[in-house]
From Swiss-Prot:
Family under the similarity heading: Belongs to the plant acyltransferase family.
Catalyzed reaction equations: anthranilate + benzoyl-CoA = N-benzoylanthranilate + CoA
E.C. no: 2.3.1.144
Protein name: Anthranilate N-benzoyltransferase protein 2
């Protein structure tokens, strides 16, 4: 699909901002490699009624000048987003130098319908998300890049490339919410807090009470038929309606030892875990891990993180089972394992995890660092259920679609709630193509 870049602007903060280095925690640094950005896409379909398009300050649908001006103002309180990475000794920092965030304006001769259901893939990412040149070193590229793409049908997309060292998904969308509010002439809803050293530094003395095996180096154990590099991976979307989710929950064995009500995420994540293990054709004795990124904001409470904390507070919950147990035991047991793993991430555990990471001079990037780009035999289920995408109204209405632009790792998936509030959810997943049809069979077999 063709795309034409019309203009690229390095947007700097509208006012003078603190010129300093921002200390990053090890939690900031271990989720992704430093030479990578996370891509996400918002889709806005132009309303049929022109009166629904009218912004109080412009008659143009998604006026780039308004977006750029608002972005410049949003970068004042969120000034680290306009900085660059640098290395200080054995760790990364953000040089808050106000060099700016990249804003790209692009056009495409295609219509939004050409992208179908907007499933993540290389083409969607290439057309809608800004690309980055990492060849000039760690301090050469922006931490935030945004692309406004106009399509022949009148609709637009806003693609984000956000650096994970700068912040996690929740902080990123709090920033986007502030940007959107400023574009409408409103004040930001939150005042960001950037001091990570104050809140996530090593305790004195360290209190490491758990093993924290989730931070150990990960080496995928691929079978021979997947080692030749010729087996393709496929990314696709699977939708679960509210009725299907309710049917899945009705399969739970209420007479089991699970005493606490299981959440929708726990049930669906457990179901995905089982379905992937079956689809891969693993032997019954093999172990498969379910890895779940968890927002620690509500779990850290001694002391609590301040509202508006801008940084990474993502921790990994991990549960392990054999393929035989996943296949033979009821879904209630599997979902119960998920619940137990999530409950284990309390304040005591997370503070111990922080001390563990800060005590290590060098930590690998867990799970997201293998050159084969696979989590095999494991699976990672990330929930985007609490990301406030509907707040991304820049003055021309809320997005009609929100999703990840590209999933790079086999076994990685995202659970995204419906945009229209009908109680459904979509699973975006990357699997080896040879496993995909069986996964679909098991995923809908309930």
């Amino acid at each position: 699909m063709s795309i034409q870049i019309k203009q690229s602007t390095m947007v700097r903060p509208a006012e003078e901002t603190p010129n300093k280095s921002l200390w990053l925690s090890k939690i900031d640094m271990i989720l992704r490699t430093p030479y990578s950005h996370t891509g996400a896409v918002l889709i806005y379909k132009q309303p049929d009624n022109n009166e629904d398009n009218i912004h109080p300050s412009s008659s143009m649908y998604f006026d780039a000048n308004i977006l750029i001006e608002a972005l410049s103002k949003a970068l004042v309180p969120y000034y680290p987003m306009a900085g660059r990475l640098k290395i200080n000794g054995d760790r990364y920092e953000i040089d808050c130098n106000a060099e700016g965030a990249l804003f790209v304006e692009a056009e495409s001769s295609h219509v939004l319908e050409d992208f179908g259901d907007f499933r993540p893939n290389d083409e969607l990412h290439r057309v809608m998300v800004p690309t980055c040149d990492y060849s000039k070193g760690i301090s050469s590229f922006p931490l935030l890049m945004v692309q406004l793409t106009r399509f022949r049908c009148g609709g637009v997309s806003i693609g984000f490339a956000q650096h994970h060292h700068a912040c996690d998904g929740m902080s990123h969308f709090e920033f986007n919410n502030s940007w959107a509010r400023i574009a409408k002439g409103l004040l930001p809803a939150l005042e960001p807090v950037h001091d990570r050293y104050l809140h996530l530094r090593l305790r004195n003395p360290p209190q490491i009470k758990y093993t924290h095996s989730q931070f150990e180096p990960f080496v995928p154990s691929l079978p021979n038929e997947l080692l030749d590099g010729k087996t393709n991976k496929s990314q696709t979307l699977f939708k679960l309606s509210r009725e299907q989710i309710n049917t899945l929950k009705q399969k739970l064995d209420l007479s089991s030892n699970t005493t606490t009500r299981l959440s929708t995420y726990e049930v669906v994540a457990g179901h995905v875990w089982r379905s992937v293990s079956k689809a891969r054709g693993l032997s019954d004795h093999e172990e498969i891990k379910l890895i779940m990124p968890v927002d620690g904001r509500s779990r850290i409470n001694n002391p609590s993180l301040p509202k508006g904390y801008c940084g990474n507070v993502v921790f990994l919950a991990v549960c392990t089972a054999t393929v035989g147990d996943l296949s033979c035991n009821p879904l209630t047991d599997t979902a119960g394992k998920v619940q137990e793993a999530l409950k284990g991430l309390d304040d005591d555990y997370l503070r111990s995890a922080i001390d563990h990471t800060e005590s290590k001079p060098d930590l690998p990037v867990p799970y997201m660092g293998s050159p084969e780009k696979t989590l095999y035999p494991n699976v990672l289920v990330n929930s985007w259920g609490r990301i406030p995408y509907q707040a991304m109204d820049f003055g021309w209405g809320s997005p009609t679609f929100f999703g990840i632009s590209n999933i790079f790792y086999d076994g990685q998936c995202f659970l995204i709630p419906s945009q229209n509030g009908d109680g459904s959810m979509t699973l975006a997943i990357n699997l080896f193509s040879s496993h995909l049809s069986l996964f679909k069979k098991y995923f809908y077999d309930f």
